[in-house]
Amino acid sequence: MSEISQTVPELVAWARKNDFSISLPVDRLSFLLAVATLNGERLDGEMSEGELVDAFRHVSDAFEQTSETIGVRANNAINEMVRQRLLNRFTSEQAEGNAIYRLTPLGIGITDYYIRQREFSTLRLSMQLSIVAGELKRAADAAQEGGDEFHWHRNVYAPLKYSVAEIFDSIDLTQRIMDEQQQQVKDDIAQLLNKDWRAAISSCELLLSETSGTLRELQDTLEAAGDKLQANLLRIQDATMSHDDLHFVDRLVFDLQSKLDRIISWGQQSIDLWIGYDRHVHKFIRTAIDMDKNRVFAQRLRQSVQTYFDDPWALTYASADRLLDMRDEEMALRDDEVTGELPPDLEYEEFNEIREQLAAIIEEQLAIYKTRQTPLDLGLVVREYLAQYPRARHFDVARIVIDQAVRLGVAQADFTGLPAKWQPINDYGAKVQAHVIDKY
């Protein structure tokens, strides 16, 4: 856990005074990664200038750069790395011209982020949590034993500061890297769906399930150890309450508790957010399949784009929410069977407008039953209405008729507890079970 004691102006002045700057285009970053990879194979962690030039040559070939100026460009790249404090150069009078290079902590940090930290490992996380649990238990035991100031610094503060806090930071870094990986998965899924969503469904499913499993593994591992870690932190906190001179330990324990709570909380929140995204993708796929069963829409859109310069067109929409959610229950009069062109009379009408118009007409016609106090047989009335509409709209029209009818009154036969008879309402097997409405 880093502790920044300087103020912002002090840090700015320090960075300006030392002329800190980092500029890593993709070729320079690739060179740094190549150096780090080769450096990892050295037992002594040292590299000669010739080895750096060889690494630069590999990068130059990969980027298809000219090989005629390889020496000059490699020398410039090495000097730039040294100037940016990514490499340390060591020279001696005995070996003039044969400098030795070592990666700096900054260089190791950057390459470690891109190389080693990209892989999530449940075993690694379990080992980290096991080490933290052991350190916390020993620190809690030492805190309960008590002792002088040296005892508290050596056996309590030091393990918390330089072991527990750093591992917490490592776990936090793992979570942040997984945040980036989630965003990359989202970008990959978007590209797959934009190219050919039918062929991409299986790939999307694989990406979604793998990411969900990784997030769940991480959170389960954290939650399993979280209670024990918090318990030991509370033991240390209780031991410091009777000592007024241990504010530094108490403050560190509070920071660790906050860090642990934040790690576990964000882990669960990340899972919840991913579940929401998972549902969104599946909903999009289902909607696309339902809308375009026969690829009519896709074919028409492709033709429209291809013939745009011959027959220009413009797309205008008034309700973005309806375009995003085509499976809204409020959108009645959907044609689930036919995916071709709409009739000319309905082509430019909103679904809700049609529903409202139809509901108003049916409400006005059914009101006659209430005015005359005439019994309303739902089975007969619904059948009469459905005869006026095509089969594809029978369900929506029947629902509107029934909704308007039950607002007028109730059937006294409903209170007898006896079930009503099933009555056919169209010639395709649809039936309704309802008593005659006779009390308005």
Swiss-Prot record:
This is Chromosome partition protein MukF. Disulfide bonds: none annotated. Signal peptide: none annotated. HAMAP family: MukF (MF_01803). Pfam families: KicB (PF03882), MukF_C (PF17193), MukF_M (PF17192). Residues 208-236 are annotated as: Leucine-zipper. GO terms for molecular function: calcium ion binding. GO terms for cellular component: cytoplasm; nucleoid. InterPro entries: Chromosome_partition_MukF, MukF_C, MukF_C_sf, MukF_M, MukF_M_sp, MukF_WHTH, WH-like_DNA-bd_sf, WH_DNA-bd_sf. The gene is mukF. Involved in chromosome condensation, segregation and cell cycle progression. May participate in facilitating chromosome segregation by condensation DNA from both sides of a centrally located replisome during cell division. Not required for mini-F plasmid partitioning. Probably acts via its interaction with MukB and MukE. Overexpression results in anucleate cells. It has a calcium binding activity. Interacts, and probably forms a ternary complex, with MukE and MukB via its C-terminal region. The complex formation is stimulated by calcium or magnesium. It is required for an interaction between MukE and MukB. Keywords: Calcium, Cell cycle, Cell division, Chromosome partition, Cytoplasm, DNA condensation. It comes from Salmonella arizonae (strain ATCC BAA-731 / CDC346-86 / RSK2980). It is found in: Cytoplasm, Nucleoid.
